């Protein structure tokens, strides 16, 4: 329909609010988070807010300056979280819907060189799941809003790797099953997918298995609408591989031949209603 500017370098992640009124973008190269209005006809409107992350991580590692990799609203639509792998922080911004503005109100300070990459929330809005790229783990938080302030209480940290693994591994993506009782995490470098069961009452994860994905550098994974299959976007090998999930045995069984695609990054699988 049209193009809109974010007044910076290209974004690596975008999301929208539940009302489809605003777009939230994350800038890896410039460490910038941006809010853009969505017009009534669905076209991209004007930029309403922008923030630049500042600071340094460990200068001994490659992630030593701001790199935002995820920007999305909390389920109550009151705050925007911005995951920054460069400075090992998740910055939390209050979101003013009337004006589309974001204001920093809190920071989750993660472990040094953990590289918090992406955060998802449970459908009931009670729990947040944060993957840390360089630590190859998932941090689980209880989330609530108390006196109009965000509260994140960490209740678990669990590895995404198996007993034997590639020491160059980096946790890349996480996805829920449609009923949110299962969580899948891809490990780039290790070239595997970790499969967790999720207790919907406590929010805690139990690791069932970590299995190879028959490709190189799985940057993203997709869960099919039937919750019985997943697809892995293997960036370096230029393939998409497909698997049938055996939940009882905790296994992934390759399903069909890989599809050749040049450096796949992300895909969305949707069920078409007849």
Q: Predicted regions span which residues?
A:
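Asp-box/WD-like beta-propeller blade repeats and closely related beta-sheet repeat scaffolds
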Residues: 2-70
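Short loop/turn segments immediately following beta-strands, especially the blade-tip
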Residues: 35-46, 93-101, 141-152, 196-203, ...
